[in-house]
Amino acid sequence: EFYEEFYAKFHYAESFPGWGEKPTFYKILNNLNLEKYKNEVYRAAKEVIVEALEKSEDKSVTVLCIGQANNVADVLSGNSALFYQKVKRVVVMCGNFNDYEYEYRLGDMYWKGEFNVILDVKSMQKLFAEKNLPVCVLDFNQGFDVLSGEGLAAQKDNPVRDAYIAHKVGQSLNMPSWDIMALMFASREFGNMFSLSEKGSISVDDDGKTTFSSESGEHCLIYRKADQKAFSECINELFMVKV
């Protein structure tokens, strides 16, 4: 219900506080050449994931989850044995493991917790109920002050630039880099920029609050080891594709 109410407000509101007018948002989207995708038939995400796992070697797959966990939870619900057989670890961007509560606001809607968790609490609960599944979590605090995207405005024909413009709607293209940092960790190429907590277990309560316990479990938290500036410079360099 919360999910439906949130997206109803997102899609049908005439304007968004701090985001700009809705017509501008849709005008930008319409300029991104989406016509060629309209007649495509897309398979369910669960089917695509299961097929990819079936074709993979045992313990060779890193699953990256930078949004809601519904697709991963769906696979675990119906194909748990396959998931454990093929997956080496799951890297997730979610949660708020600091001692304070961060409050979001959209119109008259308030909620506390982290966005990816709150929008589908049950799926996150399903994922983290798997205490023996290796799961590494980068919470939003790790990327909140790592800003990237400032150089994209000058990059013509850059799909990342188009995505940032559509998302930011007339604002500065600089934005927090939590998702990209999770991707960097998952790729292993940037492993020296991160550190890991001891192993333990992560739980999610019905309000979306995330808690880490160092008791039993195969979960761990990802911390940034490099400083804020190093991350921002690295990510901005990655964005500068050749055109």
Residue ranges and their predicted role:
Residues 1-243:
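N-terminal acidic, glycine/proline-rich low-complexity segments
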